[in-house]
Regions:
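The substrate-binding groove and active-site-proximal loops of carbohydrate-active enzymes
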Residues: 1-2, 6-9, 39-61, 113, ...
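Aromatic-lined substrate-binding rim segments of carbohydrate-active enzymes
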Residues: 1-70, 164-175, 192, 197-198, ...
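Conserved, mostly hydrophobic/aromatic
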Residues: 3, 11, 78, 119, ...
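Substrate-binding cleft of secreted/luminal carbohydrate-active enzymes
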Residues: 12, 73-77, 81-83, 230, ...
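Active-site clefts of carbohydrate-active enzymes
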Residues: 38-48, 138-153, 186, 221-260, ...
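Polysaccharide-binding and catalytic clefts of secreted carbohydrate-active enzymes
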Residues: 48, 72-193
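Aromatic-rich peripheral "rim/lid" segments of glycoside hydrolase catalytic domains that contact
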Residues: 93-108, 276-328
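Glycoside hydrolase catalytic-domain groove-lining segments
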Residues: 154, 158-243, 258-265
Length: 328
């Protein structure tokens, strides 16, 4: 009952199923794709190879296993994956080169290069390499210093395109009435955002910042934006870590909540912001030691009155602020 009385209108990512299946509040859900992954740097989750048949099957299986949600009018839609490391406009190709020869994506990369260069001598001339044959290209796991930037950029774009396209196609088959809410960018590049916007119903970001005044989609892209995570924390009460965005005390934290939410309402593309998280984390830490003071309630389920007051205040001001926002 508390969230509704505070003015909150959805249950955010990764909720307790026993709560959202009471069907009293609209909710979203998330799943992560499993399967063969690219080598190279990863964030929370590695980048799964969208050219491997297991990728498509895993997306389909995840959606089919959620048939109670895909048919539920209270379910808004699904995020897929979380905080993938996209890197720059060349990195997915670099990660592919660093991967084993058996990776489906690497075999596809070889095929694209064969179409462009024909024999291996053409690639060697362009990249400054000395591969004996195309199998040697597959076996190699070091990114050549002279690798053609256009080739890397083109394949990175192709892999991103395949990633979003396959997910979109499986949504259309198994969850046609639900929104594909994107992958919760926590770092990306403009090209990937452009590609994702073609297939996602909303572009999602985990955006830890003072506000959203600097959040802009690439030029020419007009798409709804969802904020999957944001928060502020302070050390005057609660656990012993002030969170990713520190504030001096609970009053300062509450004011920051209002200002962030206000900046979202002033951005005509932003359609929702999901606070991370409902309760403080345990003082002893979660699996990775994280013990942030980020809750709307403490670990004993006592609300932080200062923040709750500001949540209610922005709820009262919501339509006035939104109606004054510029058109996209």
């Amino acid at each position: 009952k508390s969230p509704k009385s505070w003015g909150l209108n959805t249950i955010a990512n990764s909720p307790d199923k026993d709560i959202f299946m009471r069907r009293k509040t609209p909710y979203v859900e998330r799943f992560e794709i499993k399967g063969p992954a690219l080598s190279g740097k990863a964030a929370w989750w590695p980048f799964r190879d969208p050219f491997d048949p297991a990728f498509r099957k895993n997306v389909a299986d995840n959606l089919k296993s959620r048939s109670g949600m895909t048919d539920d009018p209270w379910c808004i839609g699904f995020f897929v994956d979380n905080e993938i490391h996209w890197g720059d406009k060349f990195d997915l190709a670099r990660f592919t080169i660093m991967s084993p020869a058996s990776l489906a994506g690497k075999i596809r990369f070889k095929g694209e290069l064969e179409k462009k260069y024909g024999g291996i001598s053409g690639l060697n001339g362009a990249w400054g390499t000395k591969f004996a044959d195309w199998d040697a290209f597959l076996q190699n796991r070091e990114v050549p210093k002279g690798a053609d930037k256009k080739d890397l950029e083109d394949f990175t774009s192709l892999m991103a395109e395949e990633y979003f396209k396959v997910i979109r196609e499986e949504f259309d088959k198994f969850a046609p009435n639900k929104l594909y809410l994107g992958c919760r960018f926590a770092g990306s590049n403009e090209n990937v955002v452009r590609i994702g916007a073609k297939y996602c119903d909303a572009v999602s970001y985990n955006r830890y910042a003072d506000n959203l005044k600097k959040l802009k989609l690439p030029a020419g892209i007009d798409k709804p934006v969802m904020i999957g995570e944001w928060h502020f924390g302070a050390l005057d009460r609660g656990p012993f870590h002030p969170s990713l965005i520190k504030r001096e005390n609970q009053a300062d934290r509450a004011d920051s909540y209002y200002e962030y939410a206000k900046s979202a309402l002033e951005n005509p593309n932003v359609v929702g912001i999901h606070w991370h998280q409902f309760s403080d984390q345990a003082a002893t830490g979660r699996f990775d030691g994280e013990n942030f003071q980020v809750g709307l309630t403490d670990v004993c389920d006592t609300p932080y009155a200062e923040t709750i007051a500001k949540i209610r205040e922005i709820g009262r001001d919501l339509y006035r602020i939104r109606q004054a926002a510029p058109l996209p």
